[in-house]
Every structure is written in structure tokens, then in C-alpha cells.
Amino acid sequence: MKIQGKMFIWLAVFILAMAIIYGVWSKEPAGTTALFLAFGLSIMIGYYLAFTARRVDAGAQDNKEADVADDAGEVGFFSPHSWQPLALGIGGALAFMGVVFGWWLLYFSAPIILIGLWGWVFEYYRGESRTQ
């Protein structure tokens, strides 16, 4: 986290310099305000990361000799035979085609998305009365 905090603080310094240069040269208030707000956001994130890095133990990303696998945690449960992602993919494709070809396609895509989402969330749910 130390490296990420330093990166955001240096990014904030760069954004501040660009905001001052942009504000002086362009005299345009909207872009100058947006750049100063981006500076503030970057400072807040950088300070938070630097402050948190002092409170927690050093992670694998702070060690220059670490491998990627050193920081990898448990990925989670994988459902190899699930059809629900296919339903969500088809529904999402129809929804985005509705943006291109006509909003009427959303009437067909919304039920497919809802069925796919409902099925994926409750795929392994067996009820409250059963014990695992």
C-alpha cells in the first residue's frame, strides 16, 4: 500500500500543476474546477492509502522480491456446470442491441436478465429448513 499511496500523491502533484497551468492559460472555470477536484480526490486517496499502510502489516506488494502468487488469496467457489451466465450474457447482449437498434428490444431482454440473475443468485439455495 505504500507504493500505491506514493503513486496517488505524486499523481496529485502532477494534477495540481496541470490545474494551475490550465487555469492560467485557458481562463475556463469548469475545466479548472474539475482539475482541482481531481487533485483533491487524488490527495484523499493517497493519504488514505499511506495512512492505512502504516497501520497494517506489509503486504506482498510492498516486497520487491515477491511473486504474483504470494499475494493471491482464495478465489472462491466455482460452479462449472452453471447455465446462468449464458442467460445473463444473452440478456445483456439483447439489452445493448436495444440501445443500437431500438428500445423495444429491452422488453425482451429484461425478463431474460431477471431470470438469469435470479437463477444465478439462488442456484444452490435449498431452503431454510434443511441443514447443510
Swiss-Prot record:
Bilayer topology: Multi-pass membrane protein
Disulfide bond positions: none
Enzyme class name: translocase
Origin superkingdom: Bacteria
EC number: 7.1.1.9
Main location group: membrane
GO cellular component terms, semicolon-separated: plasma membrane
Any one GO molecular function term: cytochrome-c oxidase activity
InterPro entries: Cyt_c_oxidase_su4_actinobac
Catalyses which reaction(s): 4 Fe(II)-[cytochrome c] + O2 + 8 H(+)(in) = 4 Fe(III)-[cytochrome c] + 2 H2O + 4 H(+)(out)
Location in or out of the cell: Cell membrane
Annotated signal peptide: none
Family note: Belongs to the cytochrome c oxidase bacterial subunit CtaF family.
Task of the protein: Part of cytochrome c oxidase, its function is unknown.
Subunit and interaction comment: Associates with subunits I, II and III to form cytochrome c oxidase.
Identification of the protein by name: Probable cytochrome c oxidase polypeptide 4
Organism this protein belongs to: Streptomyces avermitilis (strain ATCC 31267 / DSM 46492 / JCM 5070 / NBRC 14893 / NCIMB 12804 / NRRL 8165 / MA-4680)
Gene designation: ctaF
